[in-house]
């Protein structure tokens, strides 16, 4: 828990690389339960997505994808978060906003999220709002 508090302090000071190092230390611990790994990976990925958007900086996409890959597919409770994060990183990877409409992989990911009964309505609503924004620009 203290490392997670340190991570937040580093993020508040814009010390993102230090935060990533601490996340990697936590996530590489051998004795952690897969649920705990998933929760920490999700938290880290969302924080890095936020940083990428806030600072218009895509340098952390590979780290985000690494964190996403640590979310166990057998943990149904986290599939909505995992799919939303995949969707968000796909958007961050676009060359420009107008290429959204022509990206079949991204549109397919959107459809899978919206049609998946195991994904919460909250996540679906967030993804739907983002989708509508990109469709109408």
Placement of each model-derived feature along the sequence:
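Soluble extracytoplasmic domains of inner/organellar membrane proteins
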Residues: 13-14, 22-137
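Non-membrane alpha-helical segments in proteins
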Residues: 1-9, 42-47
